[in-house]
């Protein structure tokens, strides 16, 4: 049996199962597209949901002289595709790239700009693209090929238009800081004034003999943040409208247009992040009002589970009863709670209005698992759509008629399948059987999931023992942890390359373990948020308790 080497892991990528890349539902809800690599070329291929059969190749890079495609995005009418290439990372999520626009009907391709830009996004009619360059917002008209700069005050470490500052990207997950209105006549955008934010410098190694120094605005706890304002730009009138709010908020973590092109939603938040106002701004009337306020004794997690429905209702998720659940609200402030229980909704997929069915993923099978459910809004009847306990990650078609599911568990690589919306299996797209067969060459140990009880709490944990484990021997212990707010390291899901690094250590005679301390996710708001204002205290207590637990096991050398 083969032993795992570092070269296997990080040089030859032996432990990389197949996946479905670039999966996107197409507008008709009957087809989907993926991006696939063959003979060093990339193709975007259209398939049928009903049977997974190929319909046609939409794009083949061998016909064009363009770099490797990092991402692709259809325009709303699917007549054009935007390609992101030569991606250059900035912070955790942000990047700048060379973009190309491909016309599906003329089979022609054009570069958006000769320079790298950020956040290129089609207008809803696909006739314009907005993007950010050098902290300013631009619009390119694809008919006339004229590019217009719509902000002029952008300057590094001073003013940012249309892209987020470090805090919003890292702490709120907001990267693109502008939104096209549904009718394409307006762009709502953020303006960050970080002039008074203190600077941080960091050495960056780019392959040369000496590093270069990156100086950027980085507010530490208690220091001054960027001053943030939201504007709406009227394209026809070439005017910028400041969205005034009654309160002076520290943060605006999200903006989103409703289905009505005059109504823009803003989240307004205080510095402690424990009070959120849901604000509706009427751009045409230049008025706004607070629809509802949410408060929390700890803090409020920002999410993207806001979905507007045709009836002027919207779906919202909240942890206000201690667990993340689904609510339907209307613009008068009325609400109906849809889900309830001591478990969390981890993803909202949407509502099929015709059948009154809502689809969501939750922890109802335990905090380390993810399962897909359908619930009828009229009868409250609920059904689980996956039949295996483990980690299910689901992507639905437009209109929610079909879905693709990825299933894995702690010891199994993902299986990708197509289904009807009632759970009926249509096709296995990839079962990674070749990968599973190859793994039999290696002497692998099982990753065991269990819980550890202490006098303070109960924690999820996993352990990997050496392949030739002998309970009468003592083994050194390697504990891996992260344990940051809302994170989860202990999941009943495939661990990708890190899983095999742990297996390599196990083959060398180590026991590897991981414990999710208080402050981590999947177990309700109280468990996750109790570290508020005391970050590091309970996490340390719990990891020490876990280490003591392991040290008392007969087969672990407590000195190692």
Feature annotation, model-predicted:
Residues 2-18, 237-244:
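A short helix->beta-strand "capping" segment at the edge of beta-propeller domains
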Residues 6, 52-55, 86-91, 95-98, ...:
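Predominantly five- to eight-bladed beta-propeller fold
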Residues 15-35, 63-81, 99, 114-132, ...:
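Conserved beta-propeller blade repeats
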Residues 34-62:
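Beta-propeller domains
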Residues 40-46, 91-98, 134-138, 197-202, ...:
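Structural motif
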Residues 49-52, 103-107, 142-145, 234-238, ...:
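Short loop/turn segments that connect beta-strands within beta-propeller blades
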Residues 54-60, 110-113, 147-155, 241-244, ...:
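Beta-propeller fold detector
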Residues 199, 261, 267, 393-560:
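Serine-hydrolase catalytic core recognition
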